[in-house]
Amino acid sequence: MNTKIKDPALLCIKEESMSLSDNTDKTDRPMCPVTTVDTVHGRSLLMSKAFTPQALFKAFHDLKKPIRFKESVQKYELNAFRNIAEFISEYQNGTYRLHRGAEFNLSERGKIRHICATPIYDRVPIRSFCDNIFIPSLRPYLIYDNCASLKGRGIDMQRNRMKVHLQRYFRQYHSNDGYILQGDFSKFFDNLDHNKIVKAISKKIKDTYSLEFIKMVLKSFCLDFSNCSDAEIEAYRNGIKIINSLNFRKANTNTTKTIGKGVEIGSEVSQIIGVFYPYRLDNYIKIVKGCKFYGRYMDDFYIIHRDKVFLENILKDIQAISEQLGLHINFKKTHIKPLNHTFIFLKTKYTLTATGKVVMSLCSDTFKREAVKLRKFKKLYLNKRLTLDTIISQFKSWRGSVTRRQFHNYKAVKQLDNLFFKLFNLKYEDLKNGKSNKQK
């Protein structure tokens, strides 16, 4: 009599291993521990929660939604069960290692960032680990006004929390007299210390194999300091000099000079570490100092208070705690401003009026960039490199993201509408329908 197999993925473990769906390099990357089986409990927390076939397939199903058009994702999906089973087999045998992904520089409004794209073969177990162990274990220790990279929160919520804090401040003091301290960390992700990260996480996650998996991921972030002298390496290690990942290349197994600092922008583990790691700072400001009107979005934070001297003193405390964490405050972007003046937080302008109204508006640069983009689209359209329907879809998407926030930018939006209609000889009905039957 044939036995019924409940999970198709379990069949694939005994089958011949297939080649990786994407041509990523498995060399020069850290390996997992030799064994993952807990002899006391039978299975580790990783294997019982995060690395089951069901959990891994769900993780792949969730992460593929916005990137399904990519070739590597489609190849992985063709043999998803076999790829998952292959990973489970490699992890249990202690032969699994992370793959080297694509690296590139991204210019974001003139600021260059070094991005490391994690291959899909590694993104699946990392996503499952984050969803089932990492985030549930660390989220209870995060304050409510820490909104980055968490499900149910995000940048819109953080902007709204700033608005709520301004409104509550006015209700409490019946005035817009006061001050706001805005702070920022220099090269936040590049200078996160691996040992301090593991020490902080180990207080919240007790499973040995989960910690080993985190160490393996962190080790893959190491940079190559072979071109630096011993004195320079020591200065980087002790935090005397600030690390900039743009000046270093990725380390490999042959690299003798590495520093356990820095995490990649692009990995989900990095995002959660960035949210969690300064939690001591959040708790000190919120609980010890009693600052109700405080919020942090990754490396940007603010404190609203009536007393300027209080903010100056707490800034010194923040600097002391940051030095213990190995973080560096960017004093060019850290300042104290009067609350009745307009200030910018997360690319949004805030003004607390004398009547208690909070006026929110997008920065003018947002509309200038879109105007430049539309003029470039016009040239591409005339050269038949872009279709009119594609341009309409892009503008509708941008316009919807601006108008749904209900900011005070009505005139600027109308000016962009008029420019769009003039450039492409369209009417509002064409924008509303989203399709154009005109042949240019």
Predicted regions and their residues:
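Non-catalytic, polymerase-adjacent accessory regions of viral genome-replication enzymes
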Residues: M1-A85, K435-K440
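Short Gly/Ser/Thr- and Asp/Glu-enriched loop/turn motifs at secondary-structure junctions
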Residues: H99-G101, G295-D299, K332
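A common structural junction motif
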Residues: I205, Q319-L327
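Conserved polymerase palm-domain catalytic core
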Residues: R171-M298, I303-D317
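Active-site-proximal segment of RNA-dependent polymerases
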Residues: L46, I133-D193
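Conserved pre-motif C helix in the palm subdomain of viral-like polymerases
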Residues: I112-I143, T256-K286
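Right-hand nucleic-acid polymerase module
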Residues: N2, P30, T118, R123, ...
